[in-house]
A protein has these predicted regions:
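N-terminal export signals
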Residues: 50-76
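Alpha/beta-hydrolase active-site loop
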Residues: 173-196
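N-terminal secretory signal peptides
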Residues: 5, 9-52
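Cap/lid segment of the alpha/beta-hydrolase catalytic domain
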Residues: 131, 157-180, 288-293
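Alpha/beta-hydrolase fold nucleophile elbow
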Residues: 197-208
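Short beta-strand/loop motif that positions the catalytic acidic residue
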Residues: 250-252
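N-terminal cap/lid segment of alpha/beta-hydrolase-fold proteins
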Residues: 81-118
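Short beta-strand element of the alpha/beta-hydrolase
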Residues: 120-129
């Protein structure tokens, strides 16, 4: 009897050590079921409320793993993932304002270019996700500048005071704005960049998530847009697709069933209207794979997609 109790105690002790180890061990995305990332996608796109998100995550809080730990892991960490500083000596950047008469009125945007540039540069409008101009998208604009372009990254939250500092707040704020009005804000940003004294007048657009939809719609609405690169963006209708003049480079995430569901009809419309496009599907990666601030980031796919994007812009804008 005494021996059995000793064995049971030893087993419980080992189990407690395992739980502590699991709690202390750094969480990796490979540790989480794909359903966790799907739930985060639903939450990040306002298809479920925070309470439901937390409740549904609870089934994955096992073996010393807590809901709080999972949520903390899924959320963006800009303090640890920022790629550039505002004082990067290779760049010249400023916050500008421009008028959006068909949109919100006065808009703010980050304007950035390479410091060592000689002469005018082709331009890229960089369009954020559904939560305002956060540090990830600012980093993307800076990277575009280092790659040889003058980049403009507008903030759709400008009429509400700008990006509030957290993505949750930004998403709530952006959800209160009208999509058509925001589209007009980015079209006005295109016109501002096109006429900038340091721009050649050849301008393309790249956008992510909501920004992918904006990129698709700018291709529909802006006849003199030189190129459009939507990353996992919702698609225009077949009727709207007929108006596209700009060449398209489209990036899709293999696990992104929500956005990918609209791709077959979009591709059919592109083919039917003899549009110029190239599309890439990146297998086994999630929506948001280019965003380096969250665990959905996939380094290999992100670098490949961005390299293709820059090559495309250099071909179409220069």
């Amino acid at each position: 009897m005494k021996k059995e109790l000793t064995i049971r105690f030893f087993i419980l002790y080992i189990d407690s050590l395992n739980l502590k180890y699991q709690a202390m061990k750094p969480l990796k995305k490979e540790d989480l079921d794909q359903e966790v990332f799907d739930l985060y996608d639903d939450y990040a796109h306002s298809r479920i409320e925070r309470r439901e998100f937390v409740n549904r995550l609870s089934k994955f809080a096992v073996g010393g793993l807590t809901v709080a730990a999972i949520m903390g892991f899924l959320m963006p960490n800009y303090a640890k993932t920022s790629l550039f500083s505002e004082a990067d000596p290779r760049l010249v950047e400023e916050t500008i304002t421009y008028d959006s008469p068909k949109g919100a009125g006065m808009m703010k945007a980050l304007l950035v270019r390479p410091k060592n540039a000689s002469g005018k540069l082709p331009g890229i409008v960089v369009v954020h996700e559904n939560r305002g101009l956060n540090p990830y998208v600012e980093d993307t604009a800076r990277q575009a500048a280092l790659d040889g372009f003058i980049a403009l990254a507008p903030d759709a939250l400008s009429p509400m005071g700008g990006y509030p500092g957290t993505d949750d707040e930004g998403r709530t704020m952006q959800g209160k704005r009208d999509k058509e009005e925001m589209l007009q804000d980015f079209i006005a940003g295109f016109e501002t960049l096109k006429s900038h004294e340091q721009c050649t007048g050849k301008v393309g657009v790249v956008g992510f998530c909501f920004g992918g939809w904006i990129s698709n719609m700018m291709a529909v609405r802006v006849p003199d847009l030189s190129a459009a690169v939507p990353f996992y963006g919702s698609q225009p209708t077949a009727e709207e697709t007929a108006a596209i003049k700009a060449p398209l480079l489209l990036h899709f995430a293999g696990l992104d069933t929500r956005v990918n569901a609209g791709w077959p009809d979009y591709e059919e419309a592109l083919k039917a209207n003899d549009k110029t496009y190239t599309a890439y599907m990146y297998p086994e990666v999630n929506h948001g794979f280019h965003n380096h601030s969250t665990p959905r980031y996939d380094e290999a796919a992100a670098k490949l997609a961005w390299g293709r994007t820059i090559d495309f812009f250099k071909e179409k804008l220069t």
